[in-house]
Curated annotation (Swiss-Prot):
GO terms for biological process: light-independent bacteriochlorophyll biosynthetic process; photosynthesis, dark reaction. [4Fe-4S] cluster binds at D36. This is Light-independent protochlorophyllide reductase subunit B. NCBIfam families: DPOR_BchB. Protochlorophyllide reductase is composed of three subunits; BchL, BchN and BchB. Forms a heterotetramer of two BchB and two BchN subunits. It comes from the Bacteria.
């Protein structure tokens, strides 16, 4: 473990909390010290859930370590069952509680409770959040659905004639990126195909619902990071086929419809005929051409990163210049996707490595997590969030799915708008020194109310006073500012910039300004120039343009 200001995934017990909180009738008792009790903060402040998470803590203190901490856990478990009346109880330790080795599973079973007790062995120092969520969901599914599983080798009974096919939607959890909205979009899409949804799990499911998973005709894997382990067990135990195409983007949604139709034996035409797409007409318009070929850097969980890479290249006409994930369990899939794009995949959970890769790639747009939003803001690059972990603004009150045809429309808005607003911002930056548009100029439509004490020279074109934003460059979005562009600091012995060249550099769009600065400094250094003038800037542009 290491000390850091940011982590893409929490310890595995956070994944268990996400599953327990997403479900009904499940409670999770965690053997943990006082400092590990952060579930309320995660689920009520960030996700803005209306109720408290289904998590209880032993909350032992330092003075308790010399006493019987096992008794504390048994008391906490018994109290949680008496108070919350769950249908199933999850028990486990936090990363700190794991060190005292009290065996929560054995202690809970010794209580002789009348409900299923599911012990979670989550190695906090080897695994992380998504693995913990997948393992918790698998343990729940196997415990609740296992008794109904047929004997090995038993053929699956055919669906009764006249009965609509039924499926399970597996993978959505609490604190997931747009999981609630994705479920709504996919349920509606399946309904248009004549397919009923038997169970959605873990989100909104109860232990009794998990016991019915084997009754469905097939399973739909919405989020492999969470559902894959459980789905593989359901395939073996019940002989259920699985639909694994994740319907993010237009092409993937059509492929998803085709796969569901093949598995369920239904006609895909109704779902394809009711496409609610607004993307194709815009893609054929003249306005779309100036976004073609934009350079995009993508980082997130494997499911969303791979889907974003496909959508960016095949549907938006973008050029993917970087692709990575923090989910090492899916490194193989991401490397295959990156290799098809001629890239080397970035597999890391260190945000500093991601920041360095983004700075080196000089993208026009960053698609990532909450941390990439911060990185892009610091580098002066437009950004859109496509993956967890996210903050409160990515749990909107409105419906904003990522999956299905409606999700494709949301992707279009989310990805294109930052680029278009970036162009507008560039125009504002270009003209900010103009006598009519500088920071201290009064709005032109309020000229009748202009203060009388201003110098008449302003109206005849005398140079205005330095705008306030130039006095504090670190607070601007100008890529030439020291804290907005990591290349701004000139190393010792490097050519210095003349004021006129700095002013001309600010006319370069902010999303390529850092690259223009570095290329110009390299051009000047190779020719032994002590200073960089406007002529040097344009000579460097011509040189690298060739």
């Amino acid at each position: 473990m290491r000390l850091t200001v940011w982590t893409y995934e929490g310890p595995p017990q956070v994944g268990a909390m996400r599953v327990a909180t997403a479900m009904r009738g499940v409670h999770y008792v965690v053997h943990a010290p006082q400092g590990d009790s952060y579930a309320d903060l995660l689920f009520t402040m960030i996700e803005r859930r209306p109720g408290r998470p289904a998590v209880s803590y032993t909350s032992f203190q330092a003075r308790d370590l010399g006493t019987d901490t096992a008794a504390l856990f048994k008391t906490a478990a018994a109290d949680a069952v008496a108070r919350f009346q769950p249908e199933a109880l999850l028990v486990g330790s936090s990363c700190t509680g794991e060190l005292i080795q009290d065996d929560p599973g054995g202690l809970a079973k010794a209580l002789g409770l009348s409900i299923p007790v599911i012990p979670l062995e989550l190695p906090s120092y080897q695994r992380k959040e998504n693995w913990g969520a997948a393992e918790t969901f698998y343990r729940l599914v196997r415990t609740m659905a296992g008794p109904a599983a047929p004997a090995p080798g038993t053929p699956r009974a055919p669906r009764p004639a006249g009965q609509r096919p039924r499926c399970n939607l597996l993978g959505p959890t609490a604190l997931g990126f747009r999981h609630r909205d994705d479920v709504q979009a996919v349920v509606a899409l399946l309904g248009r195909m004549g397919v009923d949804v038997a169970v959605v799990a873990p989100l909104g499911a109860s232990p009794a619902d998990l016991a019915r998973l084997g009754e469905a005709d097939f399973n739909v894997v919405l989020y492999p990071e969470i559902a894959d382990t459980a789905v593989r067990w359901l395939e073996r135990a019940f002989g259920q086929p699985s639909v694994r195409t994740v319907p993010i983007g237009v092409g993937a949604t059509r492929a998803f419809i085709a796969e569901v139709a093949a598995v369920a034996g239904v006609d895909p035409a109704p779902a394809l005929a009711e496409e609610s797409l607004r993307l194709p007409w815009w893609s054929r318009s003249v306005d779309s051409t100036y976004l073609t070929g934009k350079r995009v850097f993508i980082f997130g969980d494997a499911t969303h990163a791979v889907a974003a890479a496909r959508v960016a290249t095949e549907e938006f006409g973008f050029e993917v210049v970087g692709l990575g994930t923090y989910a090492r369990e899916y490194a193989r899939e991401l490397r295959a996707c990156a290799g098809a794009l001629g890239l080397e995949a970035l597999i890391t959970d260190d945000y500093l490595d991601v920041e360095a890769a983004i700075a080196d790639a000089h993208p026009d747009l960053v698609l990532g997590t909450q941390m990439e939003r911060h990185i892009a803001k610091r580098l002066g690059v437009p950004c859109a969030v496509i993956s967890a972990p996210v903050h409160v603004q990515d749990f909107p009150a409105r419906t904003a799915p990522q999956m299905g045809f409606d999700g494709a429309n949301v992707l279009f808005d989310t990805w294109v708008h930052p680029l278009m607003m970036g162009l507008e911002e560039h125009l504002l930056m270009m003209f900010r020194d103009d006598f009519e548009f500088h920071g201290d100029a009064a709005p032109s439509h309020l000229s009748a109310h202009r203060p009388t004490g201003e110098a008449v020279g302003d109206a005849v074109g005398e140079p205005p006073a330095a705008p306030r934003d130039q006095a504090a460059p670190a607070a601007t979005l100008d890529g030439s500012a020291a804290q907005s562009d990591p290349a701004r600091t000139t190393p010792p012995g490097a050519p210095s910039w003349e004021d006129s060249a700095e002013k001309e550099l600010r006319k370069v769009p902010f999303f390529v300004r850092g690259k223009a600065r570095r290329n110009t400094e390299r051009f000047a250094a190779e020719r032994g120039l002590a200073s960089i003038s406007v002529e040097t800037l344009y000579d460097a542009k011509a040189h690298f343009g060739r």
